[in-house]
């Protein structure tokens, strides 16, 4: 994964307004929660979050699964059942793939 620079982000159409949008959302959220003081704090927080997100390099270990880049990807053309069986996983597949469970 390649990290974009601020110059690259700003060169995208509308990219320069990203920080302004983040600050506006923060201001509106803060105002909703705590009135005028919340609006001021929310705007500052929105800008700080944008600055952090635009310069931060993602850490694969912080992925939702907690496994990051340690999981091998299934090669193309191999059925999921065969891939999981070869890896020693016993999987129960649901028809709509919403509640698949692998042990």
Curated annotation (Swiss-Prot):
Which pairs are disulfide-linked?
Answer: 91-102
GO process annotations (BP)? defense response to bacterium; killing of cells of another organism
Give the signal peptide, or none.
none
GO terms under cellular component: extracellular region
Q: Which coarse location class applies to the principal site listed for this UniProt protein?
A: secreted
Q: Which residues form the propeptide?
A: 1-15
Q: Which UniProt keywords apply?
A: Antibiotic, Antimicrobial, Bacteriocin, Disulfide bond, Plasmid, Secreted
> Which cellular compartments is it found in?
Secreted
Tell me the Pfam families matching this sequence: MccV
State the source organism's domain of life. Bacteria
**Transmembrane ranges?**
none
Its biological purpose:
Colicin V kills sensitive cells by disrupting the membrane potential.
What name is this protein filed under?
A: Colicin-V
* Species the sequence originates in: Escherichia coli
């Amino acid at each position: 994964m390649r990290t974009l620079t601020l110059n690259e982000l700003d060169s995208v159409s509308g990219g320069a307004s990203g920080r302004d949008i983040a600050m506006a959302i923060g201001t509106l959220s803060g105002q909703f929660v705590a009135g005028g003081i919340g609006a001021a704090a929310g705007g500052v927080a929105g800008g700080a979050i944008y600055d952090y997100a635009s310069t931060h390099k993602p850490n694969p270990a912080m992925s939702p699964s907690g496994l990051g880049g340690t999981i091998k990807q299934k090669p193309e053309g191999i059925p999921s059942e065969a891939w999981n069986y070869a890896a020693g996983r016993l999987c129960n597949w649901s028809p709509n793939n919403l509640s698949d469970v692998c042990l």
